[in-house]
């Protein structure tokens, strides 16, 4: 029995050393992978925060553009008047002449100031919205290219 124990002790020690090495190696690899996953997570969070900051800047610029549009429609209309230009729309003629008189009606009417301001305001707001949307799309595409 003593002889058996003498032969068994080196194998038990070797098994214990192997198990200890395995345990230390697996802890080391776990720590390495956890660190790598954490670094990837931090990169994604920073990229998301960066993109959100850029989108917030675009949104703030869009709000500033909308606030700046308030007086610009009046300025555009007054500039058109100074140049002796009018905003007109086509209208359906009320009637036609029976003969060949050679006269063709203009079929246009000048827009009321309120309607002109409203139309200009809508178009300018639409342009500002489209610019903000395009900036947002560019920023999101830039984020995808970084990945």
UniProtKB/Swiss-Prot annotation:
<comment type="similarity">
    <text>Belongs to the T7likevirus i-spanin family.</text>
</comment>
<keyword id="KW-0578">Host cell lysis by virus</keyword>
<dbReference type="InterPro" id="IPR004929">
    <property type="entry name" value="I-spanin"/>
</dbReference>
<keyword id="KW-0735">Signal-anchor</keyword>
<feature type="transmembrane region" description="Helical; Signal-anchor for type II membrane protein">
    <location>
        <begin position="8"/>
        <end position="24"/>
    </location>
</feature>
<keyword id="KW-0204">Cytolysis</keyword>
<dbReference type="InterPro" id="IPR016417">
    <property type="entry name" value="I-spanin_T7likevirus"/>
</dbReference>
<protein>
    <recommendedName>
        <fullName>Spanin, inner membrane subunit</fullName>
    </recommendedName>
</protein>
<keyword id="KW-1133">Transmembrane helix</keyword>
<keyword id="KW-0472">Membrane</keyword>
<dbReference type="GO" id="GO:0016020">
    <property type="term" value="C:membrane"/>
</dbReference>
<keyword id="KW-1030">Host cell inner membrane</keyword>
<dbReference type="Pfam" id="PF03245">
    <property type="entry name" value="Phage_lysis"/>
</dbReference>
<keyword id="KW-1188">Viral release from host cell</keyword>
<comment type="function">
    <text>Component of the spanin complex that disrupts the host outer membrane and participates in cell lysis during virus exit. The spanin complex conducts the final step in host lysis by disrupting the outer membrane after holin and endolysin action have permeabilized the inner membrane and degraded the host peptidoglycans. Host outer membrane disruption is possibly due to local fusion between the inner and outer membrane performed by the spanin complex.</text>
</comment>
<dbReference type="GO" id="GO:0020002">
    <property type="term" value="C:host cell plasma membrane"/>
</dbReference>
<dbReference type="GO" id="GO:0044659">
    <property type="term" value="P:viral release from host cell by cytolysis"/>
</dbReference>
<feature type="topological domain" description="Cytoplasmic">
    <location>
        <begin position="1"/>
        <end position="7"/>
    </location>
</feature>
<keyword id="KW-1032">Host cell membrane</keyword>
<keyword id="KW-1043">Host membrane</keyword>
<comment type="subunit">
    <text>Interacts (via C-terminus) with the spanin outer lipoprotein subunit (o-spanin) (via C-terminus). Part of the spanin complex which spans the entire periplasmic space. The spanin complex is composed of spanin inner membrane subunit and spanin outer membrane subunit.</text>
</comment>
<feature type="topological domain" description="Periplasmic">
    <location>
        <begin position="25"/>
        <end position="143"/>
    </location>
</feature>
<keyword id="KW-0812">Transmembrane</keyword>
């Amino acid at each position: 029995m003593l002889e058996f124990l003498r032969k068994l002790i080196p194998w038990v020690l070797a098994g214990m050393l192997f198990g200890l090495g395995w345990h230390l190696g697996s802890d080391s690899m776990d720590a390495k992978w956890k660190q790598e996953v954490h670094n990837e997570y931090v990169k994604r969070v920073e990229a998301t925060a960066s993109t959100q900051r850029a989108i917030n800047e675009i949104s703030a610029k869009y709000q500033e553009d909308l606030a700046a549009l308030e007086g610009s429609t009046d300025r555009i209309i007054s500039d058109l008047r100074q140049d002796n230009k009018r905003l007109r729309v086509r209208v359906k003629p009320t009637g036609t002449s029976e003969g060949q008189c050679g006269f063709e009606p203009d079929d246009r009417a000048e827009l009321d100031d309120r309607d002109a301001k409203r139309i200009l305001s809508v178009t300018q707001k639409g342009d500002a919205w489209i610019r903000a949307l395009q900036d947002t799309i560019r920023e999101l595409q830039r984020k995808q290219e970084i990945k």
